[in-house]
Regions:
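N-terminal periplasmic "start-of-domain" segments of outer-membrane beta-barrel proteins
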Residues: 3-33, 59-60, 75
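Outer-membrane beta-barrel transmembrane strands
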Residues: 87, 188-191, 197-199, 209, ...
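Non-catalytic regulatory/gating segments with a bias toward low-complexity or hydrophobic composition
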Residues: 22, 30, 41-42, 100-105, ...
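Short acidic/polar hinge/loop motifs at secondary-structure boundaries
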Residues: 80-106
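Transmembrane beta-barrel domains of outer membrane proteins
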Residues: 41, 103, 123, 136, ...
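Outer-membrane beta-barrel translocator/receptor signature
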Residues: 59, 73, 86, 95-98, ...
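Periplasmic-side early beta-strands and strand-to-turn transitions of outer-membrane beta-barrels
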Residues: 129-130, 138, 153-240, 247-249, ...
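Extracytoplasmic beta-strand/coil segments of soluble accessory domains associated
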Residues: 22, 39-82, 98
Length: 289
């Protein structure tokens, strides 16, 4: 029987003993289902729904029907024990992920704000556990491709680090007839991650995690559907019949995002208790036009 143990500053119990509805996705599960972002969790985990709105600006997560389309999210997201507060930061690259834990139901007692509906905890790979270099490449129709490279190195029994980067390109599907059928929803993204773990003593751990990601996405693949039924009832006639079903914009529409995340975790294990201090910093600068 496989036993999965959840070990965080909040709890250290076997998963089956937790008084909560939980789901764990291992690295093998994520590879088999091509989970490369949080939006791919829809359909894999019970009671969770993440609609695809197009850009990374809005990543609304619903668990058991509880969620938020705008403003403050109702589902929390933690990455290596660091909370991600804004929904615009939820959709990032998952090339260096070891495990995903999903806790359904209110988690505010332990995790505070933004966890009324549930919590998603993402764990990156530890350089003490994984060694070597991980290279991934992928390609798909409509000129979609991606590549990532991560190196894990254990220098000694006290220090190990991992560093890597990724790049992905989406060729787009919808065409803009006003710009010579240019793909309106194409996009590019790239970034990197560094993690260093230092064990100065047997009972003391210092864990630093820094990641950066830049995204440039096309957007607004909307088209004219014709006059509404309300307009027809008022006696109006269709004046733009030739534009029905066509995407036609004079200018490009884009969403730019710069996302920097940093977290530092200090954990001290005493004889009868564990003392943990987690500090996080997030810088999000984006623009949609």
């Amino acid at each position: 029987e496989e036993v999965v143990v959840i070990a965080t500053p909040k709890e250290n119990r076997k998963l089956r003993e937790l008084p909560a509805a939980t789901t764990v996705l291992s690295q093998k599960d994520m590879q088999a289902n091509q989970v490369n972002s949080v939006k791919r969790l829809s359909g894999l985990i019970p009671n969770i729904f993440i609609p695809e709105y197009g850009s990374k600006l809005t990543t609304s997560i619903y668990i058991r029907g509880i969620g938020s389309r705008i403003n403050t999210p109702a589902i929390g997201l933690y990455v290596d024990n660091i909370p991600y507060i804004d929904k615009s930061a939820f959709d990032f690259n998952y090339s260096d992920i070891e495990r995903i834990d999903v806790l359904r139901g209110p988690q505010g007692t332990l995790y505070g704000r933004n966890t009324m509906g549930g919590l998603i905890k993402v764990h990156t790979k530890s350089p003490f556990t994984y060694q070597g270099t991980d290279i991934r490449m992928g390609a798909a129709t409509y000129n979609d491709y991606n590549v990532s490279l991560t190196h894990y190195h254990r220098i000694s029994d006290q220090f190990a680090f991992s560093t890597g980067g990724f790049y992905e390109h989406t060729g787009g599907f919808y065409q803009n007839s006003a710009r010579n059928n240019e793909r309106v929803d194409k996009g590019n993204a790239g970034g990197g991650r560094f993690r260093g773990i230092y064990l100065p003593k047997d009972n003391l751990k210092l864990d630093l995690n820094v990641s950066y990601e830049y995204s440039d996405q096309g957007g607004y693949p909307y088209f004219y559907t014709g006059i509404t039924q309300e307009g027809i009832n008022k006696g109006k006639t269709e004046e733009r019949e030739e534009m029905i079903g066509k995407i036609a914009y004079n200018d490009r529409s884009n969403y730019y995002r710069n996302l920097l995340n940093a977290g530092f975790n200090v954990e001290y294990q005493a004889k009868n208790f564990i003392l943990s201090a987690v500090t996080g910093y997030q810088h999000l600068k984006d623009r949609m036009f």
